[in-house]
Amino acid sequence: MSNVPLATKTIRKLSNRKYEIKIYLKDENTCFERVVDMVVPLYDVCNETSGVTLESCSPNIEVIELDNTHVRIKVHGDTLKEMCFELLFPCNVNEAQVWKYVSRLLLDNVSHNDVKYKLANFRLTLNGKHLKLKEIDQPLFIYFVDDLGNYGLITKENIQNNNLQVNKDASFITIFPQYAYICLGRKVYLNEKVTFDVTTDATNITLDFNKSVNIAVSFLDIYYEVNNNEQKDLLKDLLKRYGEFEVYNADTGLIYAKNLSIKNYDTVIQVERLPVNLKVRAYTKDENGRNLCLMKITSSTEVDPEYVTSNNALLGTLRVYKKFDKSHLKIVMHNRGSGNVFPLRSLYLELSNVKGYPVKASDTSRLDVGIYKLNKIYVDNDENKIILEEIEAEYRCGRQVFHERVKLNKHQCKYTPKCPFQFVVNSPDTTIHLYGISNVCLKPKVPKNLRLWGWILDCDTSRFIKHMADGSDDLDLDVRLNRNDICLKQAIKQHYTNVIILEYANTYPNCTLSLGNNRFNNVFDMNDNKTISEYTNFTKSRQDLNNMSCILGINIGNSVNISSLPGWVTPHEAKILRSGCARVREFCKSFCDLSNKRFYAMARDLVSLLFMCNYVNIEINEAVCEYPGYVILFARAIKVINDLLLINGVDNLAGYSISLPIHYGSTEKTLPNEKYGGVDKKFKYLFLKNKLKDLMRDADFVQPPLYISTYFRTLLDAPPTDNYEKYLVDSSVQSQDVLQGLLNTCNTIDTNARVASSVIGYVYEPCGTSEHKIGSEALCKMAKEASRLGNLGLVNRINESNYNKCNKYGYRGVYENNKLKTKYYREIFDCNPNNNNELISRYGYRIMDLHKIGEIFANYDESESPCERRCHYLEDRGLLYGPEYVHHRYQESCTPNTFGNNTNCVTRNGEQHVYENSCGDNATCGRRTGYGRRSRDEWNDYRKPHVYDNCADANSSSSDSCSDSSSSSESESDSDGCCDTDASLDSDIENCYQNPSKCDAGC
């Protein structure tokens, strides 16, 4: 914006060298652009050191000095029509000298390159009578626009010197209606739009000024469209205190008066002449002149202007509407120790409304429209040990975002603002941000003494699976093979089972899901003519199981290759998942974005699965072991989904676990050898070599919140031993370095408490014999060993053959001579089943959640481009600036051939995929070396994080482990050790506060 028609509103002296100046656009139908390049001329054109400093007086305006006479102004808003600056002169100046300098400033900013001076003869009249220039004792700035769209300026100097500066290619100029100056307290206007030819040698210009006419205006009536007197009184109070209006000409758009209070019944304004057509625009503003948008106000003059012929005028009827019923309040805590953001429900705010009446509010409270003053904040420090430092609120009016932020004083468990703090409630959702230090760890922890034991069911062959008449599947909790058999309901009630996992689930690119051979549609893709019941696979049985404290899970990813797993990564992207932590991190953060159509489908599919169960188990089978970055991809996907759900009020989050293949130890030893046994060798080597365990400590990724379920291949290659049960359980908790990295734990005890063993019943026969076949005795022995090691439990693939049916004796133990030889299965674990309630309540969605989640996802499923769709979604919630700015940056980030040397941009199926080749010599994990797609960290500069974090273990510290196996030729890693594996996680609050960069726990 180089050709700017500026006008001066006020000039106020601050000191002998400093003056405050308010400028606005002379053409009141326009607004300032987001970036304005402005000329600030030298005070003395002959002295290069006489520069004038321009400083902003508003937080929405940023001034960047380009050189001695040019500045760049960045405007944070779309409807800004007025700017306030401070001018710092190099010497002492008086007001006359300031006005003279301002004349040069305005003229320099309206000038452009291709200009010429024309001879012009000016004639001035006031109300039809000749006016001498010397009778105008004020600065005179008359703007015009030429036929090319360039603005020009007529000053006193132009009139005195009979010249005019215009574009050399212009044919004519138009002087539009505008305010000119003040004469004896009366405003003087140019009323008519007049055009003059500038192609001749000399141009004759007549400026016909008109002195204003005073008229008294008032409203005919104010009508409040609300249902009850309480709401009517509320709107009356708000309108009386904050209601303002402006009056303008319906024909020319010329504004006669601004910021007039609605509470004043009779107001005198000045118009250029009578008769005149008047229009009214009403709004709400605060004491600082900021728009509030508290209500919708319409005037009858907007459609039918008032025709005024006398010195008294009625301005029609105002109608006042509420834009919403009540606003839902959200209170979120920003932990400066770890960077985590989470809802805070253990405090309440003591507020005062517009009438001064006290109001108490907490998270999820509902507030009426208005402005609320904060008096105190009460915190339950026994439940959540937090230290608050600042409070921030923001509200939107149109495309403008206004912020209020103050520091807090602490008095025991009570906080008060250091200076008056108010926040505006003018939308259906209001968010209050609190900043401080907290040791509230939001990592989904396993409840104390939790034990899981149960079965993994084959969805195709299990007798416990039944097909409903409407096409859906469900569990049959009452089925039994014979009178000695035990049904699932009885097993659960008697505490022999408290977890059931359905196997062989999968997702497909066409938005369909499957459990075994049965395919069904994504629950969000229901046709209008179908009911929700047709998509409620396992939802009824899940409710029955949850009522009995039993968890239902779904196992996804078994017996498929990498390209068939959720997310449908391409072969090229799969290679990235073999790489070092920097490339894996960058890829996961760019892929897991709802603007990515494949991830958008993946997220909807995962939520559809979670509608049927409590959590999803992701199985890393042999085909995926060479791609350990897939674990990181899934951890990032869950984080993005949980962020989106939590900030939109859905407390039931996405839970998951991981299954890994297990190798057995050396045949030379009875117990597994650490060098050979444990987690699959390829997975372990690449996971440790590429330092992926460090990413699982990052707040941008969610560690498995439930447990890791390990499974075994076969015992045909197992070494001979007298205690296979102990051997198998020991194998499941080997590779502590890998397991601690996945689970973000720091010791063997915490790790074992998160590991559940599983065994496939029909292969539990070493060397093809039935000596150690699966049975009640073997299960009890394994349960005893698992309990000794402090494991989470046993979740076994059930063998439902007639030979090995699960009868009641198989569940309870082994009888010999009518005496129980082995302890009860459930007594070995000695677990209170109510410990599952926390997991049940946290994970898995209900019908009411599903509809809300569907609305959340629907915001991304429109005809807009992915970037614009996401930006508008965030913008509606006040989390981002206007979408045009971000759309511009998004286009830059996806422009080919604009990346650094270490960055590639690949186009696939019409989509841009950006990744980096390496961290670079000095890179740290997650640092970018090129100018590719904007990472999630960079987005945080432009929006508030929305927000659920799984912070790291409070006292965990992990040391690097090196595998002695050799890597494959295709594997890639970061040689510079891009992730800091030696960073300790301090649980002390003060250390978190003093050293936030080293604290990743938030404790």
From Swiss-Prot:
Give the top-rank taxon of the lineage listed in the UniProt record for this protein: Viruses
Gene Ontology terms, cellular component aspect? viral occlusion body
Annotated protein name in UniProt:
Spheroidin
Cite the Pfam families for this sequence: Spheroidin (PF05541)
Its job: Major component of viral occlusion bodies, the protective complexes in which the virions are embedded in the cytoplasm of their insect hosts.
* Listed Low complexity bias regions: 953-970
Swiss-Prot/TrEMBL keywords: Acetylation, Disulfide bond, Late protein, Viral occlusion body
**Chain residue ranges for the region called Disordered:** 953-979
KW Acetylation (keyword) present:
yes
Positions carrying N-acetylserine: S2
Q: Is Disulfide bond a UniProt keyword of this protein?
A: yes
- What's the subunit arrangement here? May form disulfide-bond-linked aggregates.
